[in-house]
Amino acid sequence: MYKRQIYPDHWGRKNEHQDKPSKAFHDRWLNRLKEVVDNYKPDYVWFDFGIRFIHEKYKKDFLSYYYNKETEWGNEVVVSYKWHDLPPGSGLLDLELGRESELTHYDWITDTTVHDGSAWAYMKNSKYKTTTDLVHYLIDNVSKNGYMLLNIGPKPDGTIPEEDKNLLEGIGNWLDVNGEAIFETETWDQYGEGPTKMNEAGPFSDNRAKLIYTAKDFRFTTKDNFLYATALGWPSKDFTIESIYKLFDNEIERVELLGSADKVEWKHTRDGLHITRPDNKPCEHSYSFKITRKESL
């Protein structure tokens, strides 16, 4: 919901005086949001720019109204915001076409698009990101305490373009094999290791630098007593994950490659976790090694 008093022509000229919204506007803003919540029961309310001009009382009233629906409906609800439009912790920080470069203590989300650029609607002859690009994006975000909100652009008749479908199916096929390393996981002590680093972070940083990951880039997630090390390329036959070095004897019980029934040979030393991978790939794009840790030392 854009604030028309700041952008009276929607995407046109800006009101440089930045008149503060009136009480009537505030009331209409809050009532419209409540109407959407009551009639459609959304799981997620996503705010673009502009709500920083909404009075604090009205923001609190909306957040209280919506978050209390979580108990009434019996399912989780989420609000995201940009910049400093809401206080930290009151919602999910949204980084449009960008992400964090390091592991964060707070949750955040990227809204990005399947188009290789910043198109948010259907475009003829558009260039697309690859499935590998999007899978890598998802893995990197999750390892840093982030999420990915992915946009596709339907045609005017409502149908989904084949290119968009293929990308979604490709991500789905990868998750069928490796979803265990993504869904309901938590971050580890560090997000990953490898030579590929982000030079810029934050909103719109994707437009300034495109990353090409290698087989030496790994991202980490955890769940229960499992540590997942996901390689962003097919590693060499014998490789070492230096971050997973030995602290105590018999820390690790088993190493598996998700999607593969082949045995994984491994050795744990002070230099890291040395792995001999199977010969055959279980999937494409990225490869998740499931490391079972002893529950008690």
Residue ranges of model-derived segments:
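Mature catalytic domains of secreted/periplasmic carbohydrate-active enzymes
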Residues: 3-297
